[in-house]
Structure formats: structure tokens, C-alpha cells
Amino acid sequence: MGGSSISTPLDFNKIVEDVEKTLSKYPLCDHCLGRFFAKYGLGLSNRERGSSLKTMLGFKLYDDYSSKRIGRDSLLALAENAGEPLTRMVEKLFAENVNPKTCFICGGRISDEWLDSVAEAVYEKLKEASVTRFVVGVKLGRNLREKELQLVTETGFTRAESLKNEIKREVGKKVMAKYGLVPDFEKPEATAIVKLDENFNYRVELVITPVLLKGVYNKRGRNISHVPWLAKQGGRKYPLSIQEYLESRLADPFKAKKVKIHAAGREDVDARTLGPGRPLVIEIVEPLVRSYDIEDVNKLIRSDLVEVRVHKPASRRDIELLKQTSREKRKVYRLLVVSSTPISEAQLNELEAYFNDIAIQQRTPIRILTRKKDVLRVRKVYEVRTKPVSSTSFEALVYCDGGLYVKELVHCDQGRTNPCFASILNTELKPVELDVLYIEH
């Protein structure tokens, strides 16, 4: 027998004593009593479990009364708190009617009929939103939570199930059995939240899982913001945003409340995004239509000014990864730079040689200090390539870390970026155009 372990057998006498002790103080219906012993037995509902426990207690109490270990008054009090089958036993013993007390937890309101009505209300909400895969959530009123906690604390039961869990499970099972909808704990289309007050009045609210689409976007024009940008005076600062554009194309087909975007960083509003594009996730909020074909979606969002291409469905994890890794992804920028003095080809060669695998120290740019903390960050520039445009202007391709403020790399930002192009060329420089050519995926 070496190495094998033998589980401790159930002490049925102890279980019945616990039931008696509990019912001597609290009136409990079958559902609520069974729930406090939920981890005993297999394949039983809490109602069946509670009824069985009361039957077992009835055997003990009849024997105790016959052996004069319990008196009439104590037996009557237990019958009042337990209800059937103890009330029937007492009525036969004493030829006296017993009026059972209402359940301390639910007031006797939990029943198969009540659960059926909740399941029907949940189904109606799911049907309105064309949801077939769902989960049930429960929010209890404070008074109910306190009662449940009081009883568990006083009894010390360790094999109990919460009221929330019972309602979630039983309602989910009934919706599946009666209406054919499938509980899906991995990828639910919606969560039906049953909100209960202390009188077990309920209402059902539906939290619809958004449709998430993974793709990339290109901005072919300038002065296009990520999200609507309002001026301090209340008017629009820029006429178009990527989020509004997508909402205008997708909200109606999906019958959605709104559309949001999550991108791997963001370029300046006056910058274009060319090349393979910037990764993003489109979040379609509270859609009543969930089925879609990716090719049809791409046709809806096709445009010359803002080009968005959806590749596949996304998850919340995809959004997290976009946010977490955007600073790690290297980028290539194209800048058109204007100088206050003539720039020679030799100076441009010097610039290329200097900005080769070099660390750049940047404080938060002055232009965004009103909305971001003033911190020092270090980013690397791996390579710079230049091409003269005129005697006082040139193009620069910059290959660098994500998170580098590339405009400030040009003009130094009053010494807050070091080193910078202006300090090496010893002249005043201004970036007049910026394009994002490549973002590491």
C-alpha cells in the first residue's frame, strides 16, 4: 500500500449535526440549504441536495424525539425553519399545523419557476442582440451579499457555493435547454447580467462583446488625426479622424453603438503613414450584427485618403500587445528639412556618419508638455540617409527606435533633444514634412 493515500470518509453524523445547528438558527429553503453543502454529492441540484439533507435530519430528529433527546418545542422550532418534510413529521406527531418561516436568504423566492422566468428574460435580451454564444453574470444587492456572508461566517462552512454561482449556472443551463443558445466561457458574444435587489426583483442588462478586427492603416493625406480633435474653443481642430472615418463606414452595417481604434503608437497629425502601414485593432462597440466577411468589410472601408486593410479577427490580447510593444518596434521616417543657411553635400555626409547607431537623449517635447509628463527617455538612431533637394533643404531617412520624437531630432527642441541634426550642422533647421515609411510588425 506504500505511497497510496486513502481519502477520509464522509462523516454523515457531522453533516446532519451541521444541518441541525444551522436550521436551529436560520430558516432556509431547500435551494439555500443545499447551496451551503454544494460540494457534497454529484449530479444533484442544490434544491435536491437541500431536500435530501432535511430528510436525513428528519430521521435523526424522529429518533432523538423517540429517545427523549429532544423536546417538543425544539422540534417545532426546527420544523418552522426547515419546512418540508419536517413539518409533515411534526404534524403527524402532534396533530398540530406548522407554519414554516420564510427563507433567511431568498425569502422563499428561488424556485424552478423563478429561474425559468429569469432564463426567459435573459433569452429575450440575447435574441434582441442576435447573440447565440453567451455567459450569465449576477450582481446581488448589498443586503443579499451581507446575509450570505453572515451565514457562512457563523457556520464556517467550507463546501458552500455562492448564490451568484447557483443563479449563473442554473439560468445558463435553462437558456441552453429551452432555447438552444450555447454558454461559451472562452469567447462569449455577450454577458447577460442579472441584477437582483433584496426582494429578488430582477432586471437583465446585456453587455455585448465588441467585434475586434486586426489590420493596418495608411494615411495618404496630412492633418488627419487618430480620434476627433477639438480645439479649446470647442470647434474642430482637424476635419477628419481615422476613428470617425471607420465609424462612418462600419457603425451602420454592424448596427453598432460606436467604433474605436487601438493602434501601435500614433504618428503626428501632419504626418502621412505610407509603406506597409501601421498595425491597428478596430473595436466595434455593442454590435447587434456580429457575422461578417472580411472582404466585405475591406470594401466598406476602402478609401484613397485613409486606407485601412483588415486581415483577421482580433482579441483583447492583440490590443494589449499593440500597446506594450509599440515602443519596441523600430521605424523608418522620411523628413523634408529646411535650413536657415546653405547645406553642402559634405555636411550631409557628416550628418550620416554621426547618426550611426547612436543613443539620443530626449526630454518630453515642449509641444506636448501640457498633456505629458516631463521625463527623460533614451532612444537609438541606427542609420540616417540624406538627399539634397536644394541648397537650403534636404530629405532625410531616419531608421530608429519606436518612441523617438523625430521632429525634435531635427531642431533640438531648445536643447531638450541631444544630439540633434541642428547641433551637428550648426544651423537652424525646420522639419516641414514628415512621413512614416515603415513600422516593424
From Swiss-Prot:
It catalyses: uridine(54) in tRNA = pseudouridine(54) in tRNA; uridine(55) in tRNA = pseudouridine(55) in tRNA. It is an enzyme of class 5 (isomerase). GO terms for molecular function: tRNA binding; tRNA pseudouridine(55) synthase activity. Substrate binds at residues 333, 405. Its EC number is 5.4.99.25. Keywords: Isomerase, RNA-binding, tRNA processing. The active site is at residue 268. GO terms for biological process: tRNA pseudouridine synthesis. Responsible for synthesis of pseudouridine from uracil-54 and uracil-55 in the psi GC loop of transfer RNAs. Belongs to the pseudouridine synthase Pus10 family. This is tRNA pseudouridine synthase Pus10.
